[in-house]
Structure formats: structure tokens, C-alpha cells
Amino acid sequence: MFSPVIVSVIFTIAFCDASPARDGFGCSNSGITDKDRQAFLDFHNNARRRVAKGVEDSNSGKLNPAKNMYKLSWDCAMEQQLQDAIQSCPSAFAGIQGVAQNVMSWSSSGGFPDPSVKIEQTLSGWWSGAKKNGVGPDNKYNGGGLFAFSNMVYSETTKLGCAYKVCGTKLAVSCIYNGVGYITNQPMWETGQACKTGADCSTYKNSGCEDGLCTKGPDVPETNQQCPSNTGMTDSVRDTFLSVHNEFRSSVARGLEPDALGGNAPKAAKMLKMVYDCEVEASAIRHGNKCVYQHSHGEDRPGLGENIYKTSVLKFDKNKAAKQASQLWWNELKEFGVGPSNVLTTALWNRPGMQIGHYTQMAWDTTYKLGCAVVFCNDFTFGVCQYGPGGNYMGHVIYTMGQPCSQCSPGATCSVTEGLCSAP
């Protein structure tokens, strides 16, 4: 008799249409075969493709279709790391840092002469969370039996490694992912049309498209040319922080950002386009390296504002942390709102459980210097961004309202498509 043990955690914060088999995965681990690898990979990508195309069942109707849903590729190093971790057939998480993990343990008095049957049942069981429990209209992860599903479906994930191990009457099956889907109140994917060309795929640069799934280009070696005297940050992470901040500022400047208190936030007349500043980054790194989740003292960052972020995911990918932190801060506008007056008041600031100061600092129109850090601490991943000149002055408008670029400073240029004025 088979007895499954399913492991799942909630944090506060039938194979079909198989893709063409690869000639060989090139992995050195002898614990599983290329046939196993192909089966794991096909199940995931076929399921993700069904979501992307809007044909996957929910508990009522279909799941929302997905834009920017990426195709997974197999990672031999992740597979080997996982294989090493499950040698004793554990039923608990392996504690591998920087990844999400699904795991299931089976037991049978007759052993497991053909593990493939249970592997398929395991994958189907993980994936069934959405059909059993449903997913909200915004595709957000809110626990409710979606832990394993969230890791399988998270749209930004691009790499997968799976393994299994038979220990007499026990079988452990597990997969790890280079993206984390179980972030509470964050969408597992963005509703939209499945890609038709690479131009439809924007999460990663130089992406392609294959039958509704985006494909990530080859990894590019990390560089530290922008701020070579600062350690712990890379140019790609800097670019992620800066581009996301400017995308959000552009969107609010053009009147496209929903406000929880009604309508959209007003347009901005002289919203500055941010530039990345190495001295500001150095200050953010100094605070981040303390690994204490609290704001730095004002005297330690004179003239600078600050936003902070943390996740319990250890050694969380720094580019993903940069994007997630920026998104969480900015979400305060659509979750809690500011109102049409666009003024930062003590009443807004002091609403219980309704923080707004991260958003207001990001949107403060006279702020234009940005410097950030992502630090791997012992118990969490810590994100810090500092802003110059700082904002968040009580009783002041967050930004001057009006048509985009209608009040840029003399000598400044306007990026018409972005609605942003050039920085001094």
C-alpha cells in the first residue's frame, strides 16, 4: 500500500504534447536518466504553456492566460545539488539556499521497482493545487494549498532541477526552481496574451518565444563597471533597480497608475528621470551590511531618503530581489492609496497597517539619485535603496501635478514617450 507524505509551507511574507527530446542533457548524476529528466521538464513546460494560453482548468472555469511566461530549462548543477540532499529520502525540505523546493515522500512495503509512476503522480499532485483550490482574479499567491503549484507556475522562473531517490520502502521526489512563487500577496504570473514573438517577452533581455512560452537568452557574465569601487553589487542589479524605478515614475507621470482611493493617480508635470549614483549606493551598502532590518539613522545618510526590504529566502537572486522590492514598495499606491490631492499628510502616514512611505519616496518628483544594495544575511536577504535628494516631507505634494513634462526645469530635456524630465 502506498502512503504519500506531502510537505508544504506557507510563508507570511499525464504527460502530453511532449517537446522534442534532447540529444542528451549532459548531466553527470547517475541517479536519474535522461528519460526521467525529459519527463520532469515536459510536465512543467506543458503545464506552464496551458496556463499561458488560457486553457488550464481552475476550480471554476479557466485560469487567467499569462504574458511573459517563461519556458524552463534543465540545470544539471541544481539537479546534482538536490540529488545529494535527498540521499536519505527525507520528507522535509533540504534547506538549499536561493531556490524554491517542492518535495514528496512515498512509502510502500513492496518498494518502488518503477518510480516513474509515482513521479508522474507527484507532479500531478503538486500541479493540482489550482484546480482544487482556485486562484484569485489577480493571480496572487495567498497560501490556500497553492505552495507547490506556485513554484511550478511562477512566470519568471527559468531553471529547474529535479531528482528522486529510493531507500528500500521509501521514495523521495523533489524539484528545485530558480524562482520563488510563494511570496504572499504577489502575483504568480501577469494576466495577458501568450507570446507570439520574442518582442512580446520583456522580463529578460534578448528573449525569444516558442509556442506561447518565452525563452530566456544565455546568461551573461556579471560585471561591476558602473561602480567598481563598490563590492557586492553588479551592473545588472543596478540596471534592474533603476529601470524599474523609472518605469514606475513614467507610468505615474502619464496618469496610468491606479490609486486605491479612487481612479488613477494624477499626472506629473516635472517628474525627474532617475540616475544611478555610486556614492548613494555606497551608503546603501554600508547599511545593508549591518544585516539589521531597520532604517538607518538620518545622520548616517544626510540628505537621503531610504526604503528597505527583506525576504526569508536565503541568497535570493539579486535581480529578482531588486524587482520584487521595487514592486512591493510601489504597490502601496494601488493597495492603500494617496488620493487626488497628492499630498503626504500625517493622516495618510499614520494609517494602521497601510504604509505609504515607500511609494511616496519612489514617486517624489525632486528625487533623482538612486543607489541600492542587496545583501545576503544569515537569516534573510536584505534590500536597501537610498534616494537623493530625499523626499517624504509632511504637508508637501508628492509631485507637481500637470501634463507630463509641462514644467521641466529650464535647460532640461523631456523624454516624451516616458513623460520624464532629464535630471540636473
Curated annotation (Swiss-Prot):
The disulfide bridges present are none
Subcellular localization, per the record? Secreted
Domain SCP, by residue range, is 41-177, 242-387
Q: Name one GO cellular component term.
A: extracellular region
Q: Which domain of life is it from?
A: Eukaryota
Supply the InterPro entries for this chain: Allrgn_V5/Tpx1_CS, CAP_dom, CAP_sf, CRISP-related, V5_allergen-like
Principal subcellular localization: secreted
User: Which Gene3D superfamilies does this chain map to?
Assistant: CAP (3.40.33.10)
The residues forming the signal peptide are: 1-18
Instruction: Write the record's keywords in alphabetical order, separated by commas.
Output: Secreted, Signal
This chain's function reads:
Associated with the transition to parasitism by infective hookworm larvae.
* Family stated for the protein in its record: Belongs to the CRISP family.
Q: What is this protein called?
A: Ancylostoma secreted protein
What species was this sequence derived from?
Answer: Ancylostoma caninum
